A protein has these predicted regions:
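A polyampholytic, Gly/Pro-enriched intrinsically disordered region
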Residues: 74-80, 128-138, 157-159, 213-224
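Short, ordered loop/turn segments at secondary-structure junctions
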Residues: 37-38, 82-84, 142, 199-200, ...
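Class I S-adenosyl-L-methionine
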Residues: 1-110, 218, 257-260
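Short gly/ser/thr-rich secondary-structure transition/capping motifs
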Residues: 12-17, 144-146, 209
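A contiguous loop/helix-start segment that scaffolds small-molecule binding in enzyme catalytic cores
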Residues: 5, 158-261
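Class I SAM-dependent methyltransferase SAM-binding "motif I" and its flanking Rossmann-like core
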Residues: 20, 88-159
């Protein structure tokens, strides 16, 4: 029997936001591999299956095991929160396979199952913050030097992109978002809207609406399951929502469906 490897995104954490395909392949799989927290997100879907849970920082071991299990004939789901192709395990899996001389057409079958990423789920909670161009950045410097991250932040700030920040801080990493805030204040008003979403669509979900000047007051809301969305020069708040206008107001009368001359 030939095995298969699914790299599965399970979304933000609630089954309502998991794709039909993700549920389908998890059900089809006889073996589940993943970071323990992510495995727990699908605990009720994997009863009776062979389960391999890993701690954080064991990504390489996790990747090799799921590849080996699939090569041995298992149907394996490697589960990730959000989308595995965005700061997820997909990149590492394909790097390892490429290094081994893998032939996608004739060797091990691999299917990437996309999921709802944090940028989608968090944006939906706070309104319409991503209507114009935006940049997605991770503050984690475990694999990318901080100097490179700073260059990317500055480029995004100069380009007036809305920013979506993943991995804003951890117990060992607290200065990165503070440094980012200082850099952004060179280009943006202190009143620029900021949203901090932690645990989107999980029972522990919290949402803080603040601004660039005061965002450092909410360090307790930051962590590895937090996402920070920072507006651009046109972003504004309306009640508990963040709105990033697409530009219709400059062309249309929003009270009447008529195109302006």
């Amino acid at each position: 029997m030939s095995g298969k490897l699914y790299i599965v995104g399970v979304g933000p954490g609630h089954h309502d936001h998991m794709t039909y395909r993700a549920k389908q392949v998890i059900e089809e799989s006889d073996t589940i591999v993943g970071y323990a927290t992510y495995v727990n997100l699908v605990e009720d879907l994997i009863q009776g299956k062979e389960i391999h849970s890993y701690a954080m920082t064991q990504e390489v071991e996790r990747a090799h095991q799921c590849i080996d299990l699939a090569k041995d004939g298992k149907i394996v789901s490697l589960v990730s929160s959000g989308d595995p192709g965005i700061y997820g395990m997909a990149g590492l899996i394909f790097e390892i396979l490429a290094e081994s001389g893998w032939d996608p057409k004739n060797d091990l079958q691999v299917e990437l199952v996309p999921g709802v990423s944090a940028l989608n789920s968090c944006a939906s909670i706070i309104g319409s913050p991503l209507m114009t161009d935006f940049a997605v950045l991770s503050m984690s410097d475990l694999l990318v030097p901080w100097e490179i991250i700073v260059k990317r932040v500055e480029a995004a700030a100069q380009g007036d992109f809305v920013l979506v920040i993943y991995n804003p801080s951890s117990k060992k990493r607290i200065h990165q978002l503070q440094d980012t805030r200082k850099l952004l204040l060179k280009y943006r008003k202190p009143s620029t809207p900021v949203a901090i979403i932690k645990g989107a669509f999980r029972d522990s979900q919290t949402v803080v609406m603040t601004d660039l000047e005061h965002m450092e007051n909410y360090a307790d809301k930051l962590g590895m399951i937090s996402t920070v969305i920072i507006g651009n020069s046109s972003t504004y708040n309306f009640k508990d929502l963040m709105i990033n206008p697409r530009g219709y107001k400059s062309k249309y009368n929003l009270d009447e469906p008529e195109i302006k001359n």
